[in-house]
Amino acid sequence: MKSPKLYFYDVGLAAWLLGIHRPEHIQRDPLYGAMFENMIIVDRLKSKYNMARPVECYFYRDNTGNEVDLMEPERHQVHAIEIKGGATIGADYFKGLSRFKNAFPETFLDGTVIYGGDHSQQRTEWTIRSWRDVEDENR
């Protein structure tokens, strides 16, 4: 049985309900990565809704736990997006994207990592986007 992911529309409310009442405490919380992922996905959805663009998004998880956080379809392929809260790019950030690309090469269109750092860049195989630049991408 497949289980859906649930997202809070208001990440600030989610943090408050988790007992995180001061902004400086958020990055030390064990759920920071999940809240960062939630924020990025919900902001992408809001942006698309506001521009009257079709909103379709999924995630991928295989039976061994490998996953890609966000899959945005385009025709018969998908943009695979991994979301990481860390401010420094690590090799492990690309693991889920690589596994998906190798398992489904005909479906894979491109791969992007959105991370908590400040510098966007293009690498040979992947696009790396700072969370600060993601909104510009949606315009």
List where the protein language model places each region.
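Short glycine-/polar-rich loops that comprise or flank the Walker A/P-loop
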Residues: 76-78, 107-110
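Short beta-strand/turn micro-motifs composed of small residues
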Residues: 61, 84, 114-115
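Low-complexity, intrinsically disordered Gly/Pro/Thr-rich segments
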Residues: 108-118
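Short, charged, amphipathic alpha-helix that recurs within catalytic cores of restriction-modification
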Residues: 91-105
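Accessory nucleic acid-recognition modules appended to NTPase machines
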Residues: 1-78
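Domain-level recognition of nuclease-like catalytic cores that cleave nucleotide substrates
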Residues: 116-139
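Switch/connector loops and helix/strand junctions flanking conserved nucleotide-binding motifs
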Residues: 16, 90-91, 120-124
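Terminal-proximal interaction/regulatory segments of ATP-powered molecular machines
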Residues: 79, 83-86, 98
